[in-house]
Amino acid sequence: MQSGRQKYIRNFSIVAHIDHGKSTLADRLIEATGTLTEREMDTQVLDNMDLEKERGITIKSQAVRLIYKRNTGEEYTLNLIDTPGHVDFNYEVSRSLAACEGAILVVDATQGIQAQTLANCYLALDNDLEIVPVINKIDLPSARPEEVKQEIEDVIGIEAEDAPLVSAKTGLNIKDALEAIVNKVPAPDGDEKAPLKALIFDSYYDSYKGVVCHIRVKEGAIKEGTEIKLMNTGKVYEVVEVGVFVPNYMPVDELKAGDVGYVTASIKNVRDARVGDTITEAKRSANEALSGYRPAVPMVFSGIYPVDGAKYEELKEALEKLQVNDAALSFEPETSIALGFGFRCGFLGLLHMDIIQERLEREFNLDIITTAPSVIYKITKTDGTLIELTNPTNMPSPSEIKLMEEPIVKSSIITPSDYVGAVMDLAQNRRGIFKDMQYLDTTRVSLNYEIPLNEIIYDFFDALKSRTRGYASFDYELIGYKDADLVKLDILLNADVVDALSMIVPRERAYAKGRNMAQKLKEIIPRQMFEIPIQAAVGAKIIARETIKAMRKDVLAKCYGGDISRKRKLLEKQKEGKKRMRQVGSVEVPQEAFMAVLKTEE
């Protein structure tokens, strides 16, 4: 049932492909409703991290309250929830969408529908949201709004005839977008007298307030002093403050069903207020939690080590600080013979990994070495025990393995039809299994493949972009595990295994990969005073070898003529010395070597 107050509330989010102008449109809406003064307007208000502004991407979800006055004099409260657009943060997007009744689908008038437009749009449809298409960038000379409207109708199957045509950059027709939100997005409902149910769609740590939870109240009301309980963790807290974002904090007396705002309750750690959890009253609690909660599961693992071993404690502190704000980051200590003490970290995906590494270097001034990323393999041993393997170094010997499974993703690639051959070739090289293809229009094709996650984890995206001149877009989701014939490839330097360079590869590729890595390392590792053999091995079998020749002094320079036996004696003596050096010498592996191993060519 709707109250009169709820009739004037609209909760919506904006979904789009990367760079279609989502955050810019949000800025224009904020400006058009006069939420911030000209002076306070900063480009991309909702992206607060420097890293977000620089890369032009949204990493954390944000929310802001806009007051829109129609010409008829009615006042509407619009709650805009800005979501990350990247596939790594899919779960955050789905929780932000669950807090809304409608979604604005921003489509670039020059590019049309892209892979993530589709992925995010289907995510919104899964949450039963009303979708309002908005066509952006119509100020560009290459804009083709009519074709894009047709494309939205054909591909997604939603009405786009009267979609507002806007330019978020110049602020053209922003009023039309606001009108479309009011007219098309349904008002929230929910009983204000029922027991409290509120969805946490984001939470982060504020050094003064503790953990701040962004919430959407579904039923009931919440105010200062209420004793609340988090349904999935079972913990009880007392509310210190409730309020709304304008985009800065503005405390209010209470939030009722249909409202979006924030709540603080002296929670110390983000892990206690997980995204997707349900807040209810401790004394009068709801019968069941809101559906859709799942803990964040890392998909990609990588070792992070300080370049200077003495900085281990600093790295640990830095990771702990990042974890306070990022419940999806996990880490545990590990040691490597080659790199010393460090941490095995788990991430949601490659972008997440990249961002964490960059934040460690920027915000904490740490020099770090990262090892090749790996995924979680499931191994059934011969004695029937099941293990999950995140670090290739810990792989059991082949005689103990009965079955080994690797994660598989369903990927959709949208590419201009001229490049279909190149894209198919790339997907097949990466052990992709072709599922289906459909033409979106005369020039663009959507290809669906099942590809092992291990194959797209490093440079698949770069390779895809370079083969399609940057035109292809890519989106993936994990669908399950499949058994595979995999082996552990070890690299030996001077007959010692360098554990940080070990990797898991398909058996049929082991030889080529080993050969390739040995050649790469030969170019990168500096010459020493003694000869260094570089070997690639699977188990005890050496499959490839390269040798870095020793630097040597010309010991015969002082012999002019004379007897050959004199020269031989000097050469033998040098040879003995080199042999001794080789036994005691150790080889330093430069950071470039780790990076090069990742970038082995196709």
Swiss-Prot record:
Main location class = membrane
Membrane topology qualifier = Peripheral membrane protein
Compartmental location: Cell membrane
What is the catalytic activity of this protein? GTP + H2O = GDP + phosphate + H(+)
Query: Does this entry carry the keyword Endoplasmic reticulum?
Result: no
Q: Which GO terms describe its molecular function?
A: GTP binding; GTPase activity; ribosome binding; translation elongation factor activity
Q: Where does GTP bind?
A: D19, H20, G21, K22, S23, T24, N136, K137, I138, D139
Alphabetized UniProt keyword annotations: Cell membrane, GTP-binding, Hydrolase, Membrane, Nucleotide-binding, Protein biosynthesis
Query: A Gene Ontology biological process annotation?
Result: positive regulation of translation
InterPro entries from the UniProt entry: EF-4, EFG_III/V, EFG_V-like, EFTu-like_2, G_TR_CS, LepA_C_sf, LepA_CTD, LepA_IV
Q: Does the keyword Ribonucleoprotein apply?
A: no
Give the EC number(s) under which this enzyme is classified: 3.6.5.n1
A single Gene Ontology CC term: plasma membrane
One Pfam assignment: GTP_EFTU
- Location of the tr-type G domain: 7-189
Family indicated by similarity:
Belongs to the TRAFAC class translation factor GTPase superfamily. Classic translation factor GTPase family. LepA subfamily.
Q: What does this protein do?
A: Required for accurate and efficient protein synthesis under certain stress conditions. May act as a fidelity factor of the translation reaction, by catalyzing a one-codon backward translocation of tRNAs on improperly translocated ribosomes. Back-translocation proceeds from a post-translocation (POST) complex to a pre-translocation (PRE) complex, thus giving elongation factor G a second chance to translocate the tRNAs correctly. Binds to ribosomes in a GTP-dependent manner.
Q: Which NCBIfam families match?
A: lepA, small_GTP
What name does the UniProt record give this protein?
Elongation factor 4
Source organism per entry reads Clostridium botulinum (strain Kyoto / Type A2)
The lineage is: Bacteria, Bacillati, Bacillota, Clostridia, Eubacteriales
User: What gene is this protein a product of?
Assistant: lepA
